């Protein structure tokens, strides 16, 4: 029983994430994936031992599990946190956004892709 409680406490230390296509075409939850070498090395982020990501097959959004940064591999038009725009950019695949200075709490992130698909997610630091 103590091991179960300790395990659950450990899980609560990590941010939690969920993502959904706001256009209603696709409902997805980001899956926490263990480092599998080739996948992350392909994007030159092999130092991420554990990450949460959304993968539609065409685009990918990866959030480092400690909540310090966002990594995306999709043509991003804009990113906002709690309705505050933090990035407006029409080009640039594979950029990293540092969110380590954010205070602890819950955040809603909206990512608009080049095809104007909007993805809304929640994460907690």
Regions found by a protein language model. Give the residues of each.
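Bacterial Sec-dependent N-terminal signal peptides
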Residues: 1-23
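Transition segment at domain starts
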Residues: 19-55
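Short coil/turn motif common to extracellular beta-sandwich-like domains
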Residues: 54-62
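Short proline/glycine-enriched turn/loop motifs at strand-loop junctions of beta-rich domains
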Residues: 66-72
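Short, glycine-anchored, charge-dense loop/turn motifs used at functional sites
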Residues: 78-84, 107
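Short, surface-exposed loop/turn motifs with a glycine/proline- and acidic-biased composition
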Residues: 91-110
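Beta-strand-rich extracellular modules
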Residues: 112-114
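Edge beta-strands of extracellular beta-sandwich domains
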Residues: 117-125
